[in-house]
Amino acid sequence: MKRPSLITLLLLLISIRLTAQESDGLAPEITDLNSADVSYNAEKNLPDLKHPFIATEPNDRNDGIPVGKLEKKDAVLAFTKEIAEGKHGDIDSLLLSLDGELIFESYYRRGRANYPHYQMSITKSYTAMAIGRAIQLGHLTMEDLDKPVVSFLKEIDQTKLVEGAKSITLAEAMNMKSGIRIDQSTAKELMKSQGKLKGQGQIQAYLENSAPIPAAPREFKYQGSDPSMTMQVLEAVVPGSAADFIKKEVLGKMGITNYGWQDDISDLPKSAAGSSMRSRDMLKWGLMTMNEGEWNGEQLIPAEFVRKATEKINTNPQGTSYGYFWWSHEMIVGDKNYLCKSGRGAGGQFILMIPALDLIMVITAHQKGMGKMLKTAEEKILPLFVSTNSQ
């Protein structure tokens, strides 16, 4: 029997690694009929901070975030010393919130309190919440989530769609189970005529050039087509544009004004990646999500939608689960499991929420690879808030 060559084995290992990253939300953005994210390259020009900024009693900036005081200073400061020394990669910020209060705020390297940091795939999570906001305002209903995407997109020529395309629901798109499969050669050819991908033409191209869509339940595949369809539905149902709706009714309601959000090839906001948020504003997303859609006494998103979005709808063999563009997995300390709900982005961007402890960890980074902070947070930070003896 002929043995596989070393090159074949290396390619197999790379394929396995990429598949694993795609199944936990940490893979680099893979574009087909989307514009590539440019925020990472833009931030390369930021000089590293000469000295880390570390606050164990963060300032009240009158931005809607309650502040408190870190009690377990020694252990946290020992860990942040390791971050500053580069022992955990290129970390840019670490914020901790406990019981709804920001108790620790720190910035390193390219991290800035007033500069939006690229988010990569957390943009998907924000897109899901924009759909939730549309439901809260009556532009959609919870029942609409189970309706076909094409039923909202009136410009789609349904006579040209591949078999099964009409059956893809909004809920399936937000759970990465559209079933759309476009090979790279076809995608490259379609990208040569970008004018045809403007507006709903982007979705027409996906649904017209995909392999036939199988009947549900379909296989989970982490890809750009599904959030693109979701953003197109938002554009179709809200007054004005999706961009204005996100600015006014989502970000504006949380006092988020200093942000970035790139346009996709469709001229709609990007959805698979492409947003930039300040670390404090990432925390706002976490606080609002942990509070089931409520922000400063106002119900911005239906609690039912938030629960569904952060639910374990699909669980992969690695034990990581996916809802509507939000992740969840179990963190372990000793013999106890703690459910962690999260937004995740390539390069090391995280909003990690531990409901049982009312704990939120916000992390930004510019890792060359994906970094190990997801596991490090479980091993180094979480135990400090589980054990009452840690100091």
Report residues per predicted region:
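Active-site Gly/Thr loop motif
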Residues: 256-257, 307-362
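Short, charged, amphipathic alpha-helices and their helix-cap/turn boundaries
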Residues: 101-106, 148-150, 186-216, 240-259
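Active-site SXXK
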Residues: 100, 118-145, 230-234, 282-289
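Active-site-proximal alpha-helical segments within enzyme catalytic domains
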Residues: 226-233, 273-295, 349-365
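Structured C-terminal helix/loop/strand segments within mature extracytoplasmic catalytic/sensor domains
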Residues: 21-34, 343-391
